[in-house]
Amino acid sequence: IYFIDITDHTNDELKKVIMNYYYKEKIEYVFYDTLKTDIDNIGNGEELKKTATILSNLAQNFDMYIGSTLQLAETSTDPINLSVNDMAVSRTVKEVLDTLCLFKPIHTENLGNYQYSLNETDEEVYELEKFKDPDVRYYSCVVDKNRAGAKPKLLFRLNLAYNRWEELGYLRLKQQNAHTSIKD
């Protein structure tokens, strides 16, 4: 695992760094936090799309995985209802992405509004457990774009102390008179 600080970069420099590691270290996975425009185009949303296109082309041409994070805007959108409109950056970047997953925490006071199932169509659902440990949190993951198929709404439990993510199942809003069961 290599960590490289390339905070201030041009698109050419970013491409060069990735390709150097690809050829020298045989990397297959790149995680880029946080996707941003090159240093000469800060604040220009269309330039962000160019950066994303460069990364997408590298991934396709060299058979590697490139994942990145994007910031969400500060909105009051319910975690299960996130969409591309909640992104802080240009929404046009979605056009070049193969997959877009939007994550947002579910606040403890709202846990009772949600339930989850192990399979998307299951009728048996489970409650979200409240934890005393503040490092344990739930996140909604809305798959906004997926060229490979389905676009589910997923539930993850995160333990910040151990940086452990666990996919629990398919998230849904509670229904009136819904059948619930208690998970062992």
Features from the language model and the residues they span:
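C-terminal regions of RecA-like/P-loop NTPase motor modules
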Residues: Y2, N11-V30, I54, Q60-F62, ...
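A structural preference for short, hydrophobic beta-strand core positions in alpha/beta folds
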Residues: F3-D5, S68
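A generic structural signal for short
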Residues: I6, G43-N44, D78-P79
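Active-site-proximal loop/turn and secondary-structure-junction residues that shape catalytic pockets
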Residues: T7, K36, L72-E74
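Alpha-helix initiation and capping sites
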Residues: D8, D12, G45-K49, M87
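Helical hairpin unit composed of two closely spaced alpha helices linked by a short loop
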Residues: I27-M64
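Conserved H-loop
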Residues: M64, S68-Q71
